[in-house]
Amino acid sequence: MENLCDKCSSVIYSKEYHQCLANSTTRNFIVCNSTTINYDSLTMKQLCELANGGNKQVQKIILDRIQFFSYGSVPHRYIEFKKWEYFMDKIPHNQNYVRLYLCWIYYNCMEIDGSIIAHIKNLAKMCNIDAQTNYGLVNEYGIGVKKNIKKAIKWYKLSCYKENLFGLLFLGSLYERGYGVSCDKHMAFNLYEKATKHNYPAVKRQLAFMYRTGSGTTKNINKSHELYREAANQGYPLAQYALALQCKYGHGCIKNYKEAETWLIRSYNNGCLYATYSLARLYIETKSPLRNYSRAFELMQEAASENYLLAINYLAKIYKNGIGVNKNISRAIYWYYKAGNSTKITELLEINNSVIINTLDCNIFTCLDSIENEILFDIQLYILKYKYGDKCDYNLQLYQQLETIVFECIKLRNALDKSSALTTCLKPITKEYRDELSKFTIDTDVFVKHYYFNKQTYMTFGKANVKLSDDIIFFLSKKPYINIVNKLICLNKTNIDTVKDIKSINSKLQKYANLFVRYIEETVNIRNTMFQIKFSFIFR
């Protein structure tokens, strides 16, 4: 759990330093002596928050760590480079920083200043090998220019003639993937090997992967483990993550959960999203003393909140099975929806067919009106009888309770007719709907719940404040009137005619409940136009 300040409620990132927003004497205080700040204890996310807030010292610390990271290891999701004065002052002149900036622009789908591209191109033509690599990157991903893989290969090859680190890495990646060139794993392996003289951790990690899978070279698990460990010790998050998995499963080493935890924590602290998920899994799947359900739940929530699909599915499983939390089928359904996993939803609800909203013209409404009047007439007749005739106060109280229940049902139905509630609208949502659903949260926008009635599974899906149809089904399925009817029969069991009348009322009540459920199933529609627009993707 994050440690919060008692005064300003903001996160305390280190014991040595905290910029309290509630204390005017320290509000604008910036520590100049870095030795008083334990930056090593901060995660990459926390460091980025400080850097985004204008702390130049932290900006420099982060850049020193990531300037030789590959695209997949840089925590772009936490970084706001345009707020980093220290960084932007060196664009477009420092080509290492330019490469990071290009990747960040691509990750965030942002526009880039054309003058930066022009500057890179001019330097590339002047045989600046770092600029040649960057201009290849510009053309490969279409950053500020039209995507052109042939041009990208040309510039990568030019930089490779002088064995530029990133030129070798990027060209090797193209051969490994077969993108723009014929797939040649052996060529990729040779290019990565050439780059190893730079002692660059990302290259070691690529070679480790190829040794592990036997791609482009002879399979060698021990060599793979050795390279992963070297890159991990250099602080490379993806290598730390891979090494942790090898320690967890005993690939190339003796199985060691404690060491796996150590490397996953380091990788997580360096901003690796995969490590967040895997660390949560480790805390769930191992035995004591490592097992920690509460921490696992926090980590899985964190990974799911960043739309990591494996974490979203696993979080649904946590809610489904009550792993470290109370079982919550509604939230399980919600997270399976976010993952686009309709199969799991169907399994969860124990039904074979999905049902969508259905509006039918029928006479059930009239039937409900009619049976309501019949039931109320019978009940009120008995109320009068016991009130002015027989002196059985307890009978009178029970009939009055029964009358209240029927009036409550009528009230609920009237409210339902005026609402935008809906029911039986479960429809498998495929991956194409996931982005739409991710805009909403279970707490603020969506009400999702399942229930059983007469051996059938139902589901409501609607606005959080509109759950009337579910309330009604729950109310009817509990049949609160049954206990009252049973008590009335027990009190009057010696009077055969009275018991017969009570059973007649009970029969009508059960028929009424079943008709009410059918009414909800067949006629409840989405009547709120704004609601229809907002959630229209559900009913495509």
UniProtKB/Swiss-Prot annotation:
Keywords: Repeat
Keyword Repeat: yes
InterPro entries with a match to the protein in the record: Sel1-like, Sel1_AlgK, TPR-like_helical_dom_sf
Repeat in keyword set: yes
Pfam annotation, one family: Sel1
Sel1-like repeats: from-to residues: 129-164, 165-200, 201-236, 237-272, 273-308, 309-344
PANTHER family: ERAD-ASSOCIATED E3 UBIQUITIN-PROTEIN LIGASE COMPONENT HRD3, SEL-1-LIKE PROTEIN
Protein name stated in the entry: Putative sel1-like repeat-containing protein R815
